[in-house]
Amino acid sequence: MSFFGFGQSVEVEILLNDAESRKRAEHKTEDGKKEKYFLFYDGETVSGKVGLALKNPNKRLEHQGIKIEFIGQIELYYDRGNHHEFVSLVKDLARPGEITQSQAFDFEFTHVEKPYESYTGQNVKLRYFLRATISRRLNDVVKEMDIVVHTLSTYPELNSSIKMEVGIEDCLHIEFEYNKSKYHLKDVIVGKIYFLLVRIKIKHMEIDIIKRETTGTGPNVYHENVTIAKYEIMDGAPVRGESIPIRLFLAGYELTPTMRDINKKFSVRYYLNLVLIDEEERRYFKQQEVVLWRKGDIVRKSMSHQAAIASQRFEGTTSLGEVRTPSQLSDNNCRQ
């Protein structure tokens, strides 16, 4: 790796102690590509070595100290100059002096708190990384290594179904039902649509999974909606009394757990959007929020006791009632 200034005189490498056995997870980068990173959980220890290799053994490397940091950081893309750190740990590896030969320094961050899931979105990025720094008078030599953190949950104690009647007065009246209000990322959404009244010519019906990313606070709030999936549940005109089944597998889509008010910087919520299209290409829709969570039934053997406890947490939301009172889909709030 090349460095600014004195980068050509020394190479810095960060090695984890359990690199051979630790699982890797795919994570989307800022440019949309997927790469694999070492996977960690809340409460796990992060330990390893910082290796320094002199490119010219006959030259000495003077420095003002060597350190390694473990950092959890949120970056808002519209405010690139400011990085909001919610975890910042530092270990000094060497006092000011000279490096005369290649050597390695051990480090250990014990039971590190990693409260949030790694996330790369439309307007925000939450990342964890190790940063090794050789302080120099002019230019520091810096090496960073990103890791990925997953937040684990067990099955929520309360997980009521969602039932709702919606319609347009004297034109369309339907009842839809989803079997749960909270789904893990590999779950299956099971439900049904029942037509109580059909007086308009519906030709198509689908369910969309929508991710809504909210960043900022107060007047500087940005909302970004991304359609993750479109699932066709009907093609053709329904009749009164007809029931349409729903079975949507989540495992094939790029989803994250629901994230609410993360460090007071951003939120990520998911919605099921029921869309009906009539023969005149008018669109009617009804959105319903669902909670997504990462299943944590299998806990890594190498996880600490603290990490195992953390894996049992579930960040719930306001419970969704089993039955909703009928609501109307009007021209103003139901057509896209």
Swiss-Prot record:
In-chain residues carrying the UniProt-annotated modification Phosphoserine: 302, 304, 319
UniProt keyword Transport present: yes
Keywords: Cytoplasm, Endosome, Membrane, Phosphoprotein, Protein transport, Transport
Recorded topology in the membrane: Peripheral membrane protein
Gene Ontology cellular-component terms listed: early endosome; late endosome; membrane
GO biological process entries: intracellular protein transport
Primary subcellular site in the record, as a coarse category: cytoplasm
Subcellular localization, as worded in the UniProt entry: Cytoplasm; Membrane; Early endosome; Late endosome
Source species, domain of life: Eukaryota
Disulfide bridge positions per record: none
Subunit description: Component of the heterotrimeric retromer cargo-selective complex (CSC), also described as vacuolar protein sorting subcomplex (VPS), formed by VPS26 (VPS26A or VPS26B), VPS29 and VPS35. The CSC has a highly elongated structure with VPS26 and VPS29 binding independently at opposite distal ends of VPS35 as central platform. The CSC is believed to associate with variable sorting nexins to form functionally distinct retromer complex variants.
Function: Acts as a component of the retromer cargo-selective complex (CSC). The CSC is believed to be the core functional component of retromer or respective retromer complex variants acting to prevent missorting of selected transmembrane cargo proteins into the lysosomal degradation pathway. The recruitment of the CSC to the endosomal membrane involves RAB7A and SNX3. The SNX-BAR retromer mediates retrograde transport of cargo proteins from endosomes to the trans-Golgi network (TGN) and is involved in endosome-to-plasma membrane transport for cargo protein recycling.
Similarity-based family: Belongs to the VPS26 family.
PANTHER family documented for this protein: VACUOLAR PROTEIN SORTING 26 RELATED (PTHR12233)
Protein name in UniProt: Vacuolar protein sorting-associated protein 26B
Annotated source species: Pongo abelii (Sumatran orangutan)
Encoding gene (name): VPS26B
